[in-house]
From Swiss-Prot:
One of its GO terms (molecular function) is ATP hydrolysis activity. Keywords: Disease variant, DNA damage, DNA repair, Hereditary nonpolyposis colorectal cancer, Nucleus. Residues 624-650, 933-960 are annotated as: Disordered. Its main location: nucleus. It is linked to Hereditary non-polyposis colorectal cancer 7: An autosomal dominant disease associated with marked increase in cancer susceptibility. It is characterized by a familial predisposition to early-onset colorectal carcinoma (CRC) and extra-colonic tumors of the gastrointestinal, urological and female reproductive tracts. HNPCC is reported to be the most common form of inherited colorectal cancer in the Western world. Clinically, HNPCC is often divided into two subgroups. Colorectal cancer: A complex disease characterized by malignant lesions arising from the inner wall of the large intestine (the colon) and the rectum. Genetic alterations are often associated with progression from premalignant lesion (adenoma) to invasive adenocarcinoma. Risk factors for cancer of the colon and rectum include colon polyps, long-standing ulcerative colitis, and genetic family history. InterPro entries: DNA_mismatch_repair_CS, DNA_mismatch_S5_2-like, HATPase_C_sf, MutL/Mlh/PMS, MutL/Mlh/Pms-like, MutL_C, MutL_C_dimsub, MutL_C_regsub. Probably involved in the repair of mismatches in DNA. This is DNA mismatch repair protein Mlh3. Ubiquitous. CDD domains: HATPase_MutL-MLH-PMS-like, MutL_Trans_MLH3. Heterodimer of MLH1 and MLH3. Interacts with MTMR15/FAN1. GO terms for biological process: female meiosis I; male meiotic nuclear division; mismatch repair; protein localization; reciprocal meiotic recombination; synaptonemal complex assembly.
Length: 1453
């Protein structure tokens, strides 16, 4: 029959569940005092009688309220459902006092209301309330006192499970946590058993000061404030910049209510440990003591310190999950977790404590916690309507993926400019404001010659524009003296100029910054470096950039196509172009200043490729603006690369000498000959300004500065500066071709993630990860495009150089069309003197413009940690357009141009010789028409398939990975009819060895062009059909080589990879296929394993992931020949066999295994046999097997060979079927460890105590150990228990933070003696401190339960066992080996050494070896042979003996 429970039973059940501990009782009473707006709360606890008293000075209660207080569901804090949905107090159910009254034998509540004289009191006995009455003793002030007597008197089991000493510490911890959110309230805690004041926290101003009161000044000084708001959640509080050895200093509050063990704790703890350097263990001597308690663990961990409060609406969460209200559930976990993640990340970046998460950490976090980190980028509020979507996305990329690793950099002063006059100073300040501090730098020049830096709009009267794109650019104009500096806006035009000279420039810019080099007349060359911050650069540049389409500014252009250019970086350098007259004019103005300014940066979505367009053939009246470079983003074209007809060469001394004059921060060129300019014949009647660009960069890990003096037609340095050449006449200057040093943009191999790509190329300046790179220097991962004129007849310099020389042969005719430049790479080890003579005869013009670029291949030197980069930036960006080929030419030219004496270039000289042979054959046919010559050019940066309209011969701009050439469009043509198959095969195979596995290149054949087809204006001889065919072939080849399409999602701010075959998408870059020879042999068979229980499974031990990196690259020639066949147009599709198509197909579901993973013919059969044996016959050692071991002998003075029986039945005989090797050092170490453990305990145990006691040694004088107040209290409470572990404490009254250790375990003293005997420092104090901290942690976490042997003691004993054990190379006799194995068999854990490493290893089961079968004798045949011997053999023997007896002996004469 169902009946209703009585009210008393209901109260008992409810109260027993609601009040589970004494600490919770204290917390409920303290929260009531805080709700009463008390300014002082005092707590007194007696753990012997379970008495609690809480006194406050709050509002107090009158007689009516005292009469109702303590009744269930009576409260003054909540009166309606609206109050319940939006509570303003901690309590709202009216049950706390009623539950406490039910759990205690007596409860007394006395209260006095403010401005009254009477004090009222109410008593509860055994849960029943007595009538309230006036108290005999009047309170001194208003407030309430609640006294609880004999708590849990009816629940003895609950009392017993609570350790009084540990429960008191929990009470203290609860009050401390409560006080952190209420610093304006004073708290105190008194222990009535000892009469000591345990906690006394006066009022303070803020949380940080309260933290200082609790944990000391040292901890509080490390606190850093955090404040963050996202949607309905707001974070506030403090995070420490140092870590702690446990989680006791982690406090998380929700609306000032402490919560425990939530997802938020896991997330914050993970972010502080993995995404910051806070919890990274430091190896310095100062932090060793802090981490000493965890040194015995394999991976010592530190934990963050934080006090964080989350403010939100009460409807967002439910805290009533359990009575203590420390568990919480949120309505929208994702929003809160994202708020926490972004807030902590922002804090770490501000404090320079941020490190990038690794993929392994993120995966491990998701698997362990059931929820993953958020990848979505925090959207910022748009302050201006003019900002477009792609700019927002780029802002997000910059904000989300910046790295703020702590880096050590050389100290340098900021470059300051003196104020020449007040007018220009005010103008510069106004300019700074107009540009929103976009890093405008003003340099004051002290020399007599001063360049006027101007950037006017392009007005090219003689050029025809075939395609034009523009970008708004804000420039700074440094006007004449007396004029104000104006903030102008000019437009940059990119155009393909079809002028008579056919000159166009190409520039490939990088988001990295290079040093600026300025040269003044009569002055030394100074190298200025800019040191800027990433935050200001990213914010200011993106804030003020806009793309506007204003084709009206280009009135002289015949055809203008205006469109915004996405994801491009536009940089521009201000340079001067002046005639000799202007220089003389300006030389008198000594107060003139040069203004150099950074350009603004655009981040959109196609490429970082930019062009520089030269203003050609201007009239004398326009001399000032005659030579300007303009930049626009977009892909380059072959026409712009090879369209230069005139040239200019620069002679420079040895780069080594030049580099030696450069310091790390600033370098000087002492002689003017270093920048001497030679002008070759050409259009000498056109006044054109020339300038030389200098660049310093850091080479490898040597950090050496190297200067390269470059001429100027195709500037290809990132963040370049133009330096005016004032030391030469400018009346007769010509355009010239310039060596290009191109920064190869590629992913670093350290992180290997797409986030790294966006981080590196999505912002202006980035603190690089690699050691050899700095944000203020050009990285050394560069490729060259060089078209200089090198004097080939200078035999001495050519032959004595250590690098491959690059020679340009260019034909100068009277008409305006120019020949394409060709290049020779000459090797020191493979000189072709005949070819050089041939070249000298054919190129007379080379003798007139000498130039030797020594050590030029230093630009191509690649840092070791970047050599694994497999994809260039251009190939990634080309995939975004959908019509480009992915190339993997990273490091091809870099490796090729290295010094021959380096280890990594042993094969390069061979390549050089092959290339030289091919080029000599090419030059022999220089003036012939190119017939069906496939001209491979590695050009992963430009892929527009457009060609020079002024050249007479045709070059191919397609890409191939089989040619070892630079990344930039360096024409390396060869004639198929001239190059033998052997040479090309050597070239192909050598390049294959250099770059590993290659994609299939797309090949194209272009129509040959007759020499007479070129005229002065140039002819575009590529028809629309050929363009369409080229595009289609490129797409087909791209499909063959990669089934993945890249797409940049603006909303997510991430790159998405979409599989063209299946439509599946992923954020992770897919890996390339591994090509291996497809052969079948013994290694391809599967192994069937039958277990003892009858189950069967199949395994293929050869197909392990561990051996994939060591796959043999067999039959690579077949793959290369197949790729060579694709270079022809007709065989592009037809040569695709079913097998080749299948090898390129990437299964989207299952990973494909190679056909042959290990080549057993190369000496790996033995290891495979062991692996198969271990799979087929797994063995598990037992202690019973050790007794059956039979010692054979010692092996190599390191191991003991034994036979062990694996049979389950015991026959008592030694020996067996399994051959094992026993490590003699590990075995003896285990024997010594167990013996030392036995000897460490006292032999006779005390009467009545079931625990063993460690032997101790008395220290004279006692050891002084500094502890915290909490640790001292715990040690005082548990000092009797710690005596069993050999520790004896004395607590002096003079200091609260000091204990004296009178006795320590005996092994500690023995360890100290060994250390001192070896001349080392004392270790006893550090070991004792670690031992004490370990035991205190164990007391708090396990409730006082002790383990068998403390880990610290075991570690000391293991060290002693190791030092005294038998070492390797100690010879042992058979008897000594037998005694060692016998002692090992008596150990408790014979299979491991003292440190946990295995002591024995099975080799083989002799039962599985092939036994030698003895053939049974054929008795019938033996019988017949015996009979035959008796009949014939015996008679013959008798006859021989008779003849010997009848013959006389031979006597000597």
């Amino acid at each position: 029959m169902i009946k209703c429970l009585s009210v008393e039973v209901q109260a008992k059940l409810r109260s027993g569940l609601a009040i589970s501990s004494l600490g919770q009782c204290v917390e409920e009473l303290a929260l009531n005092s805080i709700d009463a707006e008390a300014k002082c709360v005092a707590v007194r606890v007696n753990m012997e009688t379970f008495q609690v008293q809480v006194i406050d000075n709050g509002f107090g209660m009158g007689s009516d309220d005292v009469e109702k207080v303590g009744n269930r569901y009576f409260t003054s804090k909540c009166h309606s459902v609206q109050d319940l949905e939006n509570p303003r107090f901690y309590g709202f159910r009216g049950e706390a006092l009623a539950n406490i009254a039910d759990m205690a034998s007596a409860v007394e509540i006395s209260s006095k209301k403010n401005r009254t004289m009477k004090t009222f009191v109410k008593l509860f006995q055994s849960g029943k309330a007595l009538k309230a009455c006036e108290a005999d003793v009047t309170r001194a002030s208003a407030g309430t006192t609640v006294t609880v007597y004999n708590l849990f008197y009816q629940l003895p089991v609950r009392r017993k499970c609570m350790d009084p000493r540990l429960e008191f510490e929990k009470v203290r911890q609860r009050i401390e946590a409560l006080s952190l959110m209420h610093p304006s309230i004073s708290f105190s805690l008194r222990n009535d058993v000892s009469g000591s004041m345990v906690l006394q926290l006066p009022k303070t101003k803020d949380v940080c000061s309260r933290f200082c009161q609790i944990y000391g000044l040292g901890k509080s000084q490390k606190l850093r404030e955090i404040s963050f708001k996202y949607k309905e959640f707001e974070l506030s509080g403090y995070i420490s910049s140092e870590a702690h050895y446990n989680k006791n200093m982690q406090f998380l509050f929700v609306n000032k209510r402490l919560v425990l063990r939530t997802k938020l704790h896991k997330l914050i703890d993970f972010l502080l440990r993995k995404e910051s350097i806070i919890c990274k263990p430091k190896n310095g001597p100062t932090s060793r003591q802090m981490n000493s308690s965890l040194r015995h663990r394999s991976t010592p961990e530190l934990y963050g310190i934080y006090v964080i409060n989350v403010q939100c609406q009460f409807c967002e969460y439910d805290v009533c999950m359990e009575p203590a209200k420390t568990l919480i559930e949120f309505q929208n976990w994702d929003t809160l977790l994202f708020c926490i993640q972004e807030g902590v990340k922002m804090f770490l970046k501000q404090e320079k404590l941020f490190v990038e998460l690794s993929g392994e950490d993120i995966k491990e976090f998701s698997e362990d916690n059931g929820f993953s980190l958020f990848d979505a980028t925090l959207q910022k509020r748009v302050t201006s309507d003019e900002r477009s979507n792609f700019q927002e996305a780029c802002n997000n990329i910059l904000d989300s993926y910046e790295m703020f690793n702590l880096q050590s950099k050389a100290v340098k002063r900021k470059t300051t400019a003196e104020n020449v006059n007040t007018q220009s100073s005010r103008d510069s300040e106004a300019t700074r404001k107009n540009t929103n501090d976009a890093f405008l730098y003003i340099y004051e020049s002290g020399g007599p010659g001063h360049s006027k830096m101007t950037e006017p709009s392009l007005q090219n009267k003689d050029s025809s524009c075939s395609e034009s794109k523009m970008l708004e650019q804000e420039t700074i104009v440094a006007s004449e003296a007396g004029e104000n500096e104006k903030h102008k806006k000019s437009f940059l035009e990119h155009s393909s100029l079809e002028n008579p000279c056919g000159t166009s420039l190409e520039m490939f810019l990088s988001p990295f910054q290079t040093p600026c080099h300025f040269e003044e007349s009569g002055q030394d060359l100074e190298i200025w470096k800019e040191s800027t911050t990433v935050n200001g650069m990213a914010a200011n540049i993106l804030k003020n950039n806009r793309i506007q389409n204003q084709p009206k500014r280009f009135k002289d252009a015949t055809e203008v196509g205006c469109q915004p250019l996405p994801f491009a970086t536009t940089l521009w350098g201000v340079h001067s172009a002046q005639t000799e007259k202007e220089k003389k004019k300006e030389s008198s103005n000594c107060g003139r200043r040069n203004v150099f300014s950074y350009g603004r940066v655009k981040l959109c979505s196609t490429g970082f490729i930019t062009h520089v367009v030269q203003n050609e053939k201007t009239k004398s009246t326009e001399t000032e603006h005659s030579f300007k470079n303009y930049v626009r983003p977009g892909p380059t074209r072959a026409q712009e690369t090879f369209g230069n007809r005139t040239r200019h060469s620069v002679e420079t001394p040895d780069i080594k000498d030049l580099a030696s004059t450069l310091s790390k921060e600033s370098g000087q060129l002492p002689n003017k000959k270093n920048c001497r300019t030679n002008i070759s014949y050409g259009l000498e009647n056109e006044p054109t300004a020339t300038y030389t660009m200098f660049s310093a960069f850091q080479e490898g890990s040597k950090k050496s500065q190297t200067d390269c003096i470059l001429s100027d037609t195709s500037p290809s340095f990132p963040w370049y500066r133009h330096v005016s050449n004032d030391s030469r006449k400018t009346d007769k200057l010509i355009g010239f071709s310039k060596p290009i040093v191109r920064k190869k943009l590629s992913l670093s191999s350290q992180l290997g993630s797409l986030e790294k790509f966006k981080r590196q190329y999505g912002k202006v300046e980035n603190p690089l990860d690699t050691e050899v790179e700095e944000s203020n220097g050009v990285t050394t991962n560069l490729s060259l495009q060089v078209e200089p004129d090198i004097l080939l007849k200078d035999k001495n310099r050519l032959e004595n150089s250590d690098v491959c020389k690059i020679t340009t042969m260019e034909h100068s005719d009277s008409d305006s069309s120019c020949q394409p430049a060709s290049h020779i790479l000459n090797s020191e080890k493979f000189p072709f003197s005949k070819d050089e003579d041939c070249l000298e005869q054919q190129m007379p013009s080379l003798r007139e413009s000498p130039m030797t670029l020594k050590e030029l291949s230093l630009f191509n030197r690649k840092p070791l940690d970047l050599e694994k980069s497999s994809e260039s930036l251009a190939s990634k960006l080309s995939r975004l357009k959908g019509s480009e080929r992915e190339t993997q030419t990273m490091g091809m030219m870099s490796r090729f141009n290295e010094l021959p004496n380096s280890d990594s270039s042993r094969k390069d000289s061979k390549l050089c010789s092959v290339l030289t042979q091919d080029f000599c054959m090419l030059f022999n046919n220089k003036h012939e028409k190119t017939e069906n010559g496939v001209i491979p050019t590695s050009d992963s940066a430009t892929q527009d398939n457009s060609f020079n309209k002024n050249s007479k011969t045709h070059s191919n701009s397609n890409t191939t990975e089989n040619c070892v050439i630079s990344e930039t469009p360096l024409v390396l043509p060869y004639n198929n009819s001239k190059v033998t198959g052997k040479d090309s095969d050597v070239l192909i195979r050598a390049s294959e060895q250099q770059i590993g596995s290659l994609d299939s290149p797309s090949g194209m054949l272009m129509n040959p062009v007759e020499d007479a087809t070129g005229d002065q204006n140039g002819i575009c001889f590529q028809s629309e059909e050929s363009k369409a065919r080229a595009c289609s072939e490129t797409e087909e080849s791209n499909t063959c080589c990669s089934d993945w399409q890249r797409h940049f999602d603006v909303a997510l701010g991430r790159m998405v990879y979409v599989n063209k075959m299946t439509g599946l998408s992923t954020f992770i870059a897919p890996t390339e296929d591994i090509q291996a020879a497809c052969t079948k042999d013994l290694t391809t068979v599967a192994v069937d394993v039958v277990l003892e229980n009858g189950s069967q499974y199949r395994c293929q031990p050869f197909r392990s992931d561990l051996v994939l990196p060591f796959l043999p690259r067999a039959r690579a020639e077949r793959t290369v020949m197949r790729q060579d066949n694709r270079d022809t147009v007709d065989d592009t599709v037809s040569s695709e066999s079913l097998q080749s198509l299948f090898s390129e197909w990437d299964n989207p579901v299952f990973a494909r295994y190679p056909e042959v993973a290990v080549d057993v013919s190369s000496g790996q059969a033995e290891s495979l046999a062991v692996k198969i044996h271990n799979i087929l016959y797994p063995y598990r050692f037992t202690k019973g097997m050790i007794h059956s071991m039979q010692v054979l002998q010692q092996v190599d003075n390191k191991f003991i060979a034994c036979l062990m029986s694996t049979k389950t039945e015991e026959n008592g005989e030694a020996g067996g079927n399994l051959l094992v090797l026993v490590d003699q050092h590990a075995a003896h170490e285990r024997i010594r460890l167990e013996q030392l453990i036995i000897d460490s305990y006292e032999k006779q145990q005390a009467q009545g105590s079931g625990r063993k006691k460690l032997l101790s040694s008395t220290l004279i004088p006692p050891l002084e150990i500094t502890v915290t107040e909490e640790q001292r209290r715990l040690l005082w409470c548990y000092h009797k228990n710690l005596e069993d572990l050999g520790l004896e404490f004395v607590f002096p009254d003079t200091s609260d933070s000091l204990v004296l250790v009178g006795k320590v375990p005996l092994c500690f003293v023995e360890r100290e003696a060994n250390e001192l005997r070896r001349g080392r420092s004392t270790v006893t104090k550090s070991i004792v401190e670690e031992f004490i901290r370990e035991q205190l942690e164990l007391l708090q976490t396990t409730g006082g339960i002790q383990g068998t042997l403390p880990l610290t003691v075991q570690k000391v004993l293991a060290s002693q066992a190791c030092h005294g054990a038998i070492k390797f190379n100690d010879g042992l006799s058979l008897q000594e080996s037998c005694r060692l194995i016998e002692a090992l068999s008596s150990c408790q854990l014979p299979f491991q050494c003292a440190h946990g490493r295995p002591s024995m290893l099975p080799l083989a089961d002799i039962d599985h070896l092939e036994q030698e079968k003895q053939i049974k004798p054929n008795l019938t045949k033996l019988r017949k042979m015996a009979q035959a011997w008796r009949l014939f053999g015996k008679a013959e023997c008798d006859t021989r003996q008779s003849l010997q007896q009848s013959m006389p002996p031979c006597e000597p004469p």
